[in-house]
Regions:
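N-terminal short beta-loop-beta anion/metal-coordinating cradle
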Residues: 1-66, 97
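Short, active-site-adjacent cap segments at secondary-structure transitions
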Residues: 12-14, 78-81
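Proline-aspartate-enriched helix->loop->beta-strand connector
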Residues: 68-72
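Mid-sequence, gly/pro-rich, charge-dense loop/helix-turn segments that line enzyme active sites
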Residues: 80-132
Length: 132
């Protein structure tokens, strides 16, 4: 399994880049993609920039150009919850938009038109992450 790891800001990716073995750099669409290994995992690291559009663009490159089979978002992931400390790991089993409101058209808050309210995470990856 090749894992893509995406972070919005350099501070969120720095430690992972420092631990990357057999590291190579690749330029794509104005971003640097770092390939190599962390432990026994083949990984591709990228600082996407902040926001859903930047993140989506970087994930598209990870999937299309680098053929990753899983993507992990590292960093604050767009939110800071009380009670969480630096280094805590949050594993989501489902995700939803926090900034979408088309309730005037009969959708639930957080649901994009003609899309599910929740996006389910891979059960396999959730269980693997919980086992660590």
């Amino acid at each position: 399994m090749k894992i893509g790891i995406i972070a919005a800001m350099p501070e969120e990716l720095k430690l992972l880049v420092e631990h990357l073995e057999m590291a190579k750099k690749h330029q794509r669409l104005g971003h640097v993609y770092h390939t190599g290994r962390i432990g026994h995992h083949e990984v591709v690291l990228v600082e996407s920039g902040i926001g859903k559009v930047m993140s989506a663009m970087s994930v598209a490159v990870l999937v299309n150009d680098f053929k990753v089979t899983a993507v992990i978002n590292t960093g604050s992931a767009g939110a800071v919850a009380s009670g969480l400390e630096i280094g805590d790991v949050v594993v989501a089993d489902r995700l939803a938009y926090h900034d979408v409101d088309v309730t005037a058209f009969g959708y639930d808050y957080g649901q994009m038109a003609r899309q599910p309210l929740y996006y389910e995470a891979s059960r396999y990856l959730v269980e693997e992450m919980k086992a660590v």
